[in-house]
């Protein structure tokens, strides 16, 4: 019974201690055995602490590695969000620019349209716009069309401009041409 208890509690430790006592043959084997067991327990405790310390360090390393991975993933996600924001911003600015251009173009054409309408209603002004294809009013029949009708390519722009300017000039003034 004592042997089983010693084996179970001390196991290999006691067997090594007795082997060491038999090998050294000290003058006081019991005191030697006590010192040897004390030293064995001290080294076993140090080994256990080292093992726990290694486990703790490994856990810290794993957690810091996970934290670094999470940080990297967050940075990558932040970079993607920033890229998407820049892309959306570029799209919005291009849409804004195109909208502003459209508004500007519409604002630019409004004075021209008003001027054309104004000239159309002035007495003695020509409704022909130089450089633009002209349509014959539907009231004229095909046989009554003037044979001297010129295509837009054939119109002398200088003559057309002089004609328009002559109507706007006060009587008795000289033509700039």
From Swiss-Prot:
**InterPro entries attached here?**
Dpy-30_motif, DYDC-like_DD, Sdc1/DPY30
Q: Which Pfam families match?
A: Dpy-30
A single Gene Ontology CC annotation of this entry is:
Set1C/COMPASS complex
Extract the CDD domains matched here: DD_DYDC-like
| Top-level taxon of origin | Eukaryota
* Family in the record: Belongs to the dpy-30 family.
Task: List, alphabetically, the PANTHER family matched.
Answer: DPY30 DOMAIN-CONTAINING PROTEIN 2, DPY30-RELATED
Q: What is this protein called?
A: DPY30 domain-containing protein 2
Recorded source organism is Homo sapiens (Human)
> Source organism lineage?
Eukaryota, Metazoa, Chordata, Craniata, Vertebrata
